[in-house]
From Swiss-Prot:
Pathway: Cofactor biosynthesis; adenosylcobalamin biosynthesis. Belongs to the CobB/CobQ family. CobQ subfamily. Residues 252-439 form the GATase cobBQ-type domain. InterPro entries: Class_I_gatase-like, CobQ/CobB/MinD/ParA_Nub-bd_dom, CobQ_GATase1, CobQ_N, CobQ_synth, GATase_3, P-loop_NTPase. GO terms for biological process: cobalamin biosynthetic process. This is Cobyric acid synthase. It comes from the Bacteria. HAMAP family: CobQ. The active site is at C333 (nucleophile), H431. The gene is cobQ. Keywords: Cobalamin biosynthesis, Glutamine amidotransferase. It comes from Pseudomonas paraeruginosa (strain DSM 24068 / PA7) (Pseudomonas aeruginosa (strain PA7)). Catalyzes amidations at positions B, D, E, and G on adenosylcobyrinic A,C-diamide. NH(2) groups are provided by glutamine, and one molecule of ATP is hydrogenolyzed for each amidation. Coiled coil: none annotated.
Amino acid sequence: MSDRGRTLMVQGTTSDAGKSTLVTALCRWLARRGVAVAPFKPQNMALNSAVTADGGEIGRAQAVQAQACRLAPHTDMNPVLLKPNTDIGAQVIIHGRAVTSMDAAAYHDYKRVAMEAVLASHARLAAAYRVVMVEGAGSPAEINLRANDIANMGFAEAVDCPVILVADIDRGGVFAHLVGTLELLSDSERERVRGFVINRFRGDIALLQPGLDWLEARTGKPVLGVLPYVSDLHLEAEDAIDTRQAAKTGPRLKVVVPVLPRISNHTDFDPLRLHPQVELSFVGPGQALPPADLIVLPGSKSVRADLAALRERGWDEAILRHLRYGGRLLGICGGLQMLGERLHDPLGLEGAAGSSAGLGLLALETTLEADKQLRNVQGRLSLEDAPLSGYEIHAGVTRGEALARPAVVLDDGRADGARSVDGNVMGTYLHGLFESTAACSALLRWAGLREVRAVDYQALRERDIERLADLVERHLDTGRLLALCGEPHA
């Protein structure tokens, strides 16, 4: 199958080389030119996911890329999503739906089946859009993963598309990364690489030029451009927790997030990280929970195991002490389930079957069931009747007296989550709460911030996507890029 000129793939020499960001930038750049473009990632491994318009889930990076294309997210944009639930295993999601969990060895054999889903999704996008902009995963030169590859060159070879190779110069060794990656590819794969992009450069480009000249002479391939290091660009991280904060002055609300082993959808906290009046702290193993106005228990892919880890670290006692001194506590999704009295996993969906005691802060019990709830929702927060939008991704069914005091009333008539009698503890299944300006402000006031400055997080994200497209215009060889996409250019 040949889609040359319609499909362009971005691969990286390493993880976090800038693949997601470059694809986002190229998508908006093409969309601004009036090109019908769609993002695509054959296989993603991440615990940050988004709910699509067709009722499935994909990686959040692809949802941001869809926004860059001015499209609603769709499951075809990320047909295979792997959500790790143990150190050696993951839940396998095909076309937005969880199909099974398996260990790494079993998944290696399953890749042939997964590839069928990948090619079917790509074919649908290629038929519907002029350009499909593809993001690879990790590095194409992982020798142990090359057999049955569906994420990098295995996919590129299957659809016969050109590849751009991006490398991060800020971490050092950029020329070794690029040349070394090429050396580890097969002849046909090496031929497929049509150029390089160097990412996160800071300094005088004239001092880099001799290295660029050497690279082109050594490889016979062009450098398509050098993107500058941008410190204040804040798009959602694909998997690693982004702890960077905007410059802040004046009084700030202290918010603490305990980082659990299987934390999921930590992009929930990006609006707080960027809020000028919030001091956000992620606390990891071996650290005590510091004094805070608000503690937020995040989502989790393995709630009972993460609850056990929370206790092992002594954080349960710290949370109770926090409440005794008047602090506020919020649980999101798995965090809500932890706040209840019992958590049951009779089918062993997240590990060994069994039950665990919760923190006992809300009169609730949760039972994990095989059917996962996936919804984009709108509603109103019980605090200040603030309007909000968010999304549900969970397998739990929660029951109990505390549900009579819901955290959110949804527009479809359902009640979501619960509040404690004294009002100091609240839990919800909804991700994305802090992205809604009014709801975020209401939650910050509830936590003790008196004069809240409203921040439009959606506008910040849109601004940064536009800035990325501007960088493409200024720093990359747009003529060559258009040619690789099969688009006319002056």
